[in-house]
Amino acid sequence: MLRDLFAPAGLVPLLLSSPAAATLLYASSYSGAVTTLNLTLSGTNATQSTLQSLSSSNGCAPSPSWLQLDKANARLFCTDEGLTTNVGTVSSFKTGADGVLEQLAKTETISSPVSAVVFGGKGQGLAIAQYGGSSVSWFDISNPAALTPVKSETFNMSAPGPNPSRQDAPHPHEVFLDPKGQFVLVPDLGADLVRVFAVDGANNLVAVDSLVAAPGSGPRHVEFLVTPEGKTYLYLISELANTVTTYDVAYRENKTLGFTEVFSGSTYGAGASAPAGASAAEIWISSDGKFLTVSSRNDSAFSISNPDTPGEGAQIPSDSLNTFTIDAKTGGLTLLQKFPAGGRIPRQFSVSKAGDLVAVGLQSDSRVVVISRDAASGKLGEILTSAKVDGEVTAVIFDE
């Protein structure tokens, strides 16, 4: 998502060398738990940092899949994919400085919710993408102790897509709010679409024209960039094709969005193909608009020291985080750096508000790692610390 401006680059070393700078993170996993982690940065360049579990909640069980923080209202939303049931759920929690999550509400959804986003002028709506249920639902969340269904839209396809095993039906994979708060975008992996909904009032959505993606590409997640010159770009990461595609976005008078493709390239850089079996996952753009980072799963591009047992010499395979520089004039991307994600299957990652820390959720290793990042250069530095989390990690976010 678009974030506040970075702190000046000169402030970053001060943060990393502070005696005990503490930050809270939340991690969800298929164990059924949402775990609060305490990150303490200490030592020169944070080389003696620690990441420890503070508390845990099973209120989003059995299969937590996504975390959405509403920091302004001290609320955390969690979707439960319902892997062992026929329905999904969404839960809300009150957050606190001690890291303890107090459950406020929980309600059923259509099956397999995998993403949620708060929308509406006062944050009174919550949209949810339901991958297995081929649908999008939205809720009235104006009452913190209630999650009231407003409406659902279920999608259909007349025939499977070019990749029948993955595109047997529509599979909405994310809900994402545009920079103006006027639209919710829904990448649909199964239908090769980015569905678009206009925000209508405090907690309602209205379907408008969709973006048609390349056949068989499998849209997964999106990010927006607004340039200093006022251009708006949409960046789409596609799981099946392992590509990032840039669209010039136009806000039309009829309250729809127009999309013009201006760039498309591999998640591994110009002229590079994804390794067999690799699949693109997360995408993020720095708030200064200069850098874009993606995670790639199942490429085993690196062999690294086990972050859980530093100094013992054990080596483990690691998938990739690939960073690109952004050409704000054209929307194009140029590969800047390939970096180990800290283990296997980096399903999701988050970046701190200051842009100096990256938290990665490694699904297959049941691990969260924290990596240093130079906000000025855009490059990742080193794995600072890690923590084991019960179950397959599905999301990790900073409490900020």
Q: What are the roles of these predicted feature ranges?
A:
Residues 1-23:
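Fungal secretory targeting signals
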Residues 22-23, 72-74, 121-124, 180-182, ...:
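Short coil/turn segments that connect the beta-strands within blades of beta-propeller domains
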Residues 27, 78-79, 128, 186, ...:
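Residue position within the beta-strands of beta-propeller blades
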Residues 36-47, 92-100, 138-148, 197-204, ...:
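Short loop/turn segments immediately following beta-strands, especially the blade-tip
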Residues 56-60, 106-110, 164-169, 210-215, ...:
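Surface loop/turn motifs at the tips and blade-to-blade linkers of beta-strand repeat domains
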Residues 68, 117-118, 176, 223, ...:
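Conserved beta-strand position repeated across blades of beta-propeller domains
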Residues 100-174:
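Asp-box/WD-like beta-propeller blade repeats and closely related beta-sheet repeat scaffolds
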Residues 277-363:
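Loop/turn-rich, solvent-exposed surfaces of beta-rich toroidal or solenoidal domains
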